[in-house]
């Protein structure tokens, strides 16, 4: 993340707070509340954060990463890390990748 311009920075707070709430309440079986309508904007923000993280990693690849690493590997690596790292969620991410 270092050196990246996060286009979705305003969503960061709304994305992190539910994760803390979720970790506290998951053991009580109320995680289903996350899917309630009032949390929809959190899910959208988290999706945007992950998309920007993927775009950032693709940009970093051009500067720092080994030349032989394929785009698909970069995307897979980012996709494995970002959903749980940023939101603790695993719902599908729809991203427009840079050309």
Curated annotation (Swiss-Prot):
Biological classification of the source: Eukaryota, Viridiplantae, Streptophyta, Embryophyta, Tracheophyta
Self-association and partners: Heterodimer.
Highest taxon, organism lineage: Eukaryota
Function: Has antibacterial activity against Gram-negative Klebsiella sp. but not against E.coli, Proteus sp., Salmonella sp. and Xanthomonas sp. or against Gram-positive bacteria S.pyogenes, S.aureus and Rathayibacter sp. Has no antifungal activity.
GO BP, one annotated term: defense response to bacterium
Family, as annotated: Belongs to the 2S seed storage albumins family.
UniProt KW Lipid biosynthesis keyword: no
SUPFAM superfamilies named in the record: Bifunctional inhibitor/lipid-transfer protein/seed storage 2S albumin
Protein name: Antimicrobial protein 2
InterPro entries on file: Bifun_inhib/LTP/seed_sf
UniProt keywords, alphabetically: Antibiotic, Antimicrobial
């Amino acid at each position: 993340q270092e050196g990246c311009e996060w286009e979705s920075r305003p969503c960061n707070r709304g994305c992190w707070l539910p994760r803390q709430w979720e970790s506290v309440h998951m053991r009580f079986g109320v995680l289903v509340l996350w899917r309630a309508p009032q949390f929809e904007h959190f899910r959208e923000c988290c999706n945007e954060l992950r998309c920007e993280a993927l775009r950032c990693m693709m940009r970093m690849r051009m500067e720092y990463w080994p030349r032989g690493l394929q785009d698909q590997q970069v995307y897979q690596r980012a996709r494995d890390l970002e959903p749980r790292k940023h939101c603790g969620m695993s719902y599908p991410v729809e991203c427009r990748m840079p050309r």
